[in-house]
């Protein structure tokens, strides 16, 4: 692998991508990626896709409803047409990010269940506002029963 001569220069690079709740997300430079062959980049792509599938398995193993909750909230997050600056939506976003980071609805260290910062009414209205066919509930299931069971 060729060493990029610019690596020796002090560059300003923001390693912190985002902070929320008690978490800080970092990113890193991957020197030499541009010099990889197309075949090597393709391998990295397929490994990343395998990791995403493994992530779903981990979510499922960490809790019976984790995957369903994540997919439901992701649907609300991507399809919601309301005010995204509303405190309830902002809190839903933070809750979803915590779920992504911890691979489920429990804290990654303390194992405490996350408490949503949005109201049940907001979630109900948000779920009503999205196409029900996009929600991951399965045939004949209703989100109303699921929400009662999952968020108590």
What spans do the regions from the language model cover?
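N-terminal helix-rich structural modules
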Residues: 8-152
């Amino acid at each position: 692998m060729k060493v990029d001569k610019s690596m020796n220069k002090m560059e300003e690079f923001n390693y912190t991508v985002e902070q929320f709740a008690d978490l800080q997300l970092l990113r890193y430079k991957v020197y030499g990626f541009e010099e990889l062959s197309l075949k090597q980049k393709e391998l990295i792509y397929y490994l990343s896709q395998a990791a995403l599938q493994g992530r779903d398995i981990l979510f499922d193993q960490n809790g019976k409803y984790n995957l369903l909750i994540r997919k439901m909230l992701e649907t609300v997050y991507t399809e919601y047409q309301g005010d995204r600056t509303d405190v309830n939506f902002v809190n839903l976003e933070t809750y979803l990010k915590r779920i992504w980071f911890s691979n489920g609805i429990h804290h990654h260290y303390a194992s405490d269940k996350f408490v949503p910062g949005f109201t049940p009414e907001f979630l109900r209205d948000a779920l009503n506002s999205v196409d029900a066919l996009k929600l991951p509930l399965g045939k004949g299931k209703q989100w109303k029963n699921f929400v009662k069971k999952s968020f108590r």
